């Protein structure tokens, strides 16, 4: 039986009078790789930002191992440290080296000693192929390399779940493959991942489940085979038809 990590119940989010998420329900089990697809403005990124508490939901519940992390008195900082996020724009510290970027959070948030944090950072920088660049600063490396560092930084925090917010959309086309390759390796290693993406081949080939969002709601979800080969709703078919040659 799969181990339930996250359960989202009736989640809604409004900015002023504009509701961007409406009554969202879904679950995340250990080892799940869930791709969230949909047109721009459908609420995908806002959903991830709510899960990471970068945005506060207007209503609903986010249960982490059965505990509602939106309830007053819950240690949200501890929760955030267990749910990592990789951003479209990398969000690296430009005044730090690659290695320092991957060490800083471990020391400040997890209270690791620098030697342990350094060794842990190197483990993941080697895994993403960035060990030769540990003394470089973000301005000295390519976009694809920055995103690989961002993934290593997130993994060095030992998250239980990793959220990816369109991790390849800011990259030049020739750099997309190197980042997707790292993400495939993570998925195959058993990392629990939620990925907002426009990379349909990745969603189809790597995901355990695909969620299609439109207008702030989950319109349809299922296995990649179900969603890509036999979508049940016309709006899902219309969206996917844009990606078929």
List PLM regions with ranges.
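ABC family nucleotide-binding domain
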Residues: 3-224
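C-terminal boundary and immediately downstream tail of ABC-type ATPase nucleotide-binding domains
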Residues: 221, 225-245
